[in-house]
């Protein structure tokens, strides 16, 4: 874990014995996962006035020894019988990125990709 002023970083560790999970209301509408020089960015709906599940979270990050998951959540919605709901995400994968550990490093590495 690294807690910056702007970003929270959770690292996947293949030696981890205890799973880790964090959830939050993310007003920026994106979350990212860096692996080597590859960067996965997930964009999603963000409305701080909407009601979200899991104590108001619109994004959750989970990791254990095998994986790291970046999950976005839809606002709570009441559907009529037979109704439908669509939750959209936009994914992008970038190669040749350099991500440091400080908030400034992250800003520099990701700002042109958002």
Identify the residue ranges that each predicted region occupies.
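A contiguous, surface-exposed recognition patch within enzymatic or periplasmic domains that forms
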Residues: 1-86, 101-109
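Short, hydrophobic/aromatic-enriched beta-strand segments in well-ordered soluble domains
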Residues: 83-96
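Extended, compositionally biased alpha-helical segments that mediate assembly or anchoring
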Residues: 97-101, 112-114
């Amino acid at each position: 874990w690294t807690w910056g002023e702007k970003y929270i970083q959770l690292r996947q560790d293949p030696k981890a014995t205890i799973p880790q999970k964090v959830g939050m209301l993310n007003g920026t509408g994106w979350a990212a996962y860096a692996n080597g020089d590859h960067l996965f960015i997930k964009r999603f709906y963000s409305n701080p006035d909407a009601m979200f599940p899991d104590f108001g979270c619109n994004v959750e990050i989970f990791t254990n020894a095998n994986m790291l998951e970046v999950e976005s959540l839809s606002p709570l919605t009441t559907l009529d019988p037979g109704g439908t709901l669509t939750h959209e995400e936009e994914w992008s994968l970038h190669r040749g990125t350099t991500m440091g550990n400080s908030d400034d490093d992250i800003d520099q590495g990701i700002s042109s990709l958002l």
